[in-house]
């Protein structure tokens, strides 16, 4: 069957971004591909990234993601970022997945053949050991020959005020200084762009930045490219006459004869319903408004005067004149939520 909506993943853009971020950080990359590679397709992106010389390994959030990637045998280290259930440890270790550890109890439960990365909570108050406790955990892992790396996560590195991120870095260094030399990583995308090379770090973990999206105040640092372009087909064309309304709630009313294209993308596909009244698409070479409420499976677009046919494509966001940042703003949300919310009915393909 023909896809009704497609997310085109640019291998060239991803390759460019990975090279630029590795150069900026001065390290190799541990690329997060969690949440279906931020909506881009975990297996697809995993294969592309594994072929890049600047990528040391891949990082995921759940044991299920880890198992899926490990079975692809991509030839790169794979780090699970969040603690698995105790009964999952053996299977993950058998697959070669690097495991996160932050307590002495987790050290004791770790299979003897597993490698671990010590997670340090330097201020995020999410996961990890506080610095005062982390050293003992790290030393216990090192004594067992299982400490491959140490990591933390910045809470504010993508903000203009970097004072708290610098405090976190000081706390992280206090742990590193008390442990034998191992892989160390702390910089997310904001950290890479804000700080550049951080002395003593072995890896960087740029998430959304690797896919081409960064806060506006950091865009001048690296010329990153959006990796994803989303397009959906025109399913039907008709005319709305003066006085007629379009979509649920009858919110939009035609003041003139209006060409209407029904485009196969809706909130069930991840397009934010909150963008109603503000959203637009690129179609027939122009930016045109979405009419009325966005529906579950489709949206209606004003194509008056355009040469558009059934089966033509409308661009929802991409590298051109309409970005996912626009869509997120219209939907009162953030790029992360739009991208990771992209539905399974949208086919991911390279090109």
From Swiss-Prot:
Molecular function in Gene Ontology: alanine racemase activity; pyridoxal phosphate binding
Record GO cellular component, one term: cytosol
Binding site for substrate: 126, 296
GO terms of biological process kind: D-alanine biosynthetic process
InterPro entries listed in its UniProt record: Ala_racemase, Ala_racemase/Decarboxylase_C, Ala_racemase_C, Ala_racemase_N, Ala_racemase_pyridoxalP-BS, PLP-binding_barrel
Recorded catalytic activity of this chain's protein: L-alanine = D-alanine
Gene3D superfamilies: Alanine racemase (3.20.20.10), Lyase, Ornithine Decarboxylase, Chain A, domain 1 (2.40.37.10)
Active-site residues annotated for this sequence: 34 (proton acceptor), 248 (proton acceptor)
Needed cofactors: pyridoxal 5'-phosphate
Pfam name, any one: Ala_racemase_N
Keywords associated with the record: Isomerase, Pyridoxal phosphate
Enzyme class: isomerase
N6-(pyridoxal phosphate)lysine: modified positions: 34
Enzyme Commission numbers on file: 5.1.1.1
Biological or metabolic pathway of the protein: Amino-acid biosynthesis; D-alanine biosynthesis; D-alanine from L-alanine: step 1/1
Function: Catalyzes the interconversion of L-alanine and D-alanine. May also act on other amino acids.
NCBIfam families: alr
Annotated family: Belongs to the alanine racemase family.
Protein name: Alanine racemase
Lineage: Bacteria, Thermotogati, Deinococcota, Deinococci, Deinococcales
């Amino acid at each position: 069957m023909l896809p009704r909506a497609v997310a085109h993943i640019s291998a060239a853009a991803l390759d460019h971004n990975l090279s630029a971020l590795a150069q900026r950080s001065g390290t190799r990359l541990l690329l997060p591909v969690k949440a279906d590679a931020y909506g881009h397709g975990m297996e697809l992106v995993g294969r592309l990234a594994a072929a890049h010389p600047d990528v040391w390994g891949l990082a995921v959030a759940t044991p299920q993601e880890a198992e899926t990637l490990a079975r692809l045998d991509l030839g790169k280290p794979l780090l699970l970022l969040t603690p698995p259930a105790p009964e999952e440890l053996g299977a993950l270790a058998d697959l070669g997945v690097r495991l996160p550890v932050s307590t002495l109890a987790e050290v004791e439960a770790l299979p003897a053949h597993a490698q671990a990365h010590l997670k340090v909570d330097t201020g995020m108050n999410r996961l990890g050991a506080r610095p005062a406790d982390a050293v003992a955990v790290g030393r216990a892992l090192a004594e067992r020959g299982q400490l491959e790396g140490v990591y933390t996560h910045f809470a504010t590195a993508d903000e203009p005020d970097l004072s708290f991120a610098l405090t976190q870095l000081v706390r992280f260094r206090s742990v590193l200084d008390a442990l034998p030399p191992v892989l160390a990583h702390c910089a997310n995308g904001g950290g890479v762009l804000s700080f550049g090379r951080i002395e003593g770090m072995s890896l960087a973990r740029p998430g959304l930045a690797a896919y081409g999206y960064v806060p506006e105040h950091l865009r001048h640092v690296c010329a990153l490219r959006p990796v994803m372009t989303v397009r959906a087909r025109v399913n039907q064309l008709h005319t709305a006459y003066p006085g007629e309304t379009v979509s649920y709630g009858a919110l939009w009313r035609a003041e003139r004869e209006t060409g209407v294209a029904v485009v196969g993308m809706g909130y069930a596909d991840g397009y934010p319903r909150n963008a109603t009244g503000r959203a637009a698409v690129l179609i027939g070479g122009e930016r045109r408004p979405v009419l009325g409420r966005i529906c579950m499976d489709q949206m209606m677009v004003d194509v008056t005067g355009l040469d558009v046919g059934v089966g033509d494509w409308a661009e929802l966001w991409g590298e051109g004149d309409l970005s996912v940042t626009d869509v997120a703003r219209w939907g009162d949300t953030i790029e992360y939520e739009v991208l990771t919310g992209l539905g399974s009915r949208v086919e991911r393909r390279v090109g």
